[in-house]
């Protein structure tokens, strides 16, 4: 059997590669295309292996692994969440991911996922709103103006036509930065001085805060009939963004209940509180929005299938392009069983001055 060529090489997508791919595609186009992959995979939800992400919690944050497989491809993401990182000039969230071939176990792709996670989170939020928000929704309150905020705004614009954004953050500089970054994209933007002001007249409310504690970003009196709430900040036990009474008034939609009950807003509720899985709405097995008066809540914590979709999308996009580089990642001896022989040959090569 002839030897297969370049088995040691895995395509690697660096941060620079990912940025170039996004801007050359157009950020809004990228979000729309990525959303298509996510929705396609949600519609075949039952074909995936699914487990809650594997988390290692510490005093200051969490490190997680998020694996899944559809039987043909296997993907996982390494991701952290450390809210205090910004004080030392670091990102709150960083990530990378791998997509592999199930038959051989060989990696097909290694990619940065800090930027890609922000894109896939925003795309998933906007997909949910497509099914759960009122069809005439054009105004969104965006509470928490950190690293995720601009991505959320652009995804909602690209997928459902939101063009008015009401911003609020406890840090006015974050709001000012977000406003500057979004001005070129055609939004009508209002910087608000409180969360209460931000939600006035909003059709959709997105919360995307980072603090790792039980907070009340939204209180019950702030939520009127017909609103869709996009709760993005939940990602670990003990971290919530809204008052429990809001949950009791809302129809709640989730990605994967076993994970959301641990990490999402619904950790405040009884373990058997009824929720609807988003994939069932997409496939017509359950109903999303039933009336213009209904309050809907997407309790988003992020799930591995979204990362799988993102890696699959990027793999397809970079194939044959300049948006990746070859990475010598896998040992590839001439004889598969002679791994030690590789070391001996390398030793001999170095002795000869190579």
From Swiss-Prot:
Protein function: Catalyzes the conversion of L-ornithine into L-proline with release of ammonia. Is involved in the utilization of nopaline, a catabolic pathway that proceeds through L-arginine and L-ornithine to L-proline. Nopaline is a predominant opine in plant cells transformed with Ti plasmid pTiC58.
Keyword line: Lyase, NAD, Plasmid
GO biological process: L-proline biosynthetic process
Broadest EC class assigned to this enzyme: lyase
Pfam families according to UniProt: OCD_Mu_crystall
Cofactor (UniProt): NAD(+)
Protein name per its UniProtKB record: Ornithine cyclodeaminase
Source organism superkingdom: Bacteria
């Amino acid at each position: 059997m002839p030897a297969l060529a370049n088995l040691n090489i895995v395509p690697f997508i660096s941060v620079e590669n990912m940025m170039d791919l996004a801007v050359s595609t157009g950020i809004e186009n990228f979000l729309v295309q990525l959303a298509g992959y996510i929705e396609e995979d949600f519609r075949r939800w039952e074909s995936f292996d699914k487990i809650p992400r594997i988390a290692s919690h510490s005093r200051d944050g969490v490190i997680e692994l998020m694996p899944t497989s559809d039987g043909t491809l296997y993907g996982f993401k390494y991701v952290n969440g450390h809210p205090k990182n910004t004080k030392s000039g670091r990102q709150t969230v960083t990530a990378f991911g791998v997509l592999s071939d199930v038959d051989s176990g060989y990696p097909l792709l290694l990619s940065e996922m800090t930027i890609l996670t922000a894109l896939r989170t925003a795309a998933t939020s906007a997909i949910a709103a497509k099914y759960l928000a009122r069809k005439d929704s054009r105004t969104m309150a965006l509470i928490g103006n950190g690293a995720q905020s601009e991505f959320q705004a652009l995804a909602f614009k690209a997928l459902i036509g939101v063009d008015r954004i009401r911003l609020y953050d406890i840090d006015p500089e974050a709001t000012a930065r977000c406003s500057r970054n979004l001005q070129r994209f055609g939004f009508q933007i209002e910087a608000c001085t409180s969360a209460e002001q931000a939600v006035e007249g909003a059709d959709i409310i997105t919360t995307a805060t980072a603090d790792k504690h039980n907070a009340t970003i939204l209180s019950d009196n702030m939520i009127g009939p017909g609103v869709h709430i996009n709760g993005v900040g939940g990602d670990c036990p003990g971290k919530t963004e809204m008052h429990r009474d809001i949950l009791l008034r809302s129809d709640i939609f989730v990605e994967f209940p076993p994970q959301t009950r641990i990490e999402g807003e619904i950790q405040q509720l009884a373990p058997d509180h009824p929720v609807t899985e988003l994939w069932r709405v997409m496939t017509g097995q359950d109903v999303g929005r039933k009336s213009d008066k209904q309050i809907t809540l997407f309790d988003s914590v992020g799930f591995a299938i979204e990362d799988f979709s993102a890696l699959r999308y990027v793999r397809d996009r970079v194939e044959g392009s300049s948006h990746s580089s070859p990475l010598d990642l896998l040992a590839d001896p001439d004889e598969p069983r002679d791994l030690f022989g590789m070391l001996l040959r390398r030793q001999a090569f170095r002795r000869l001055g190579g």
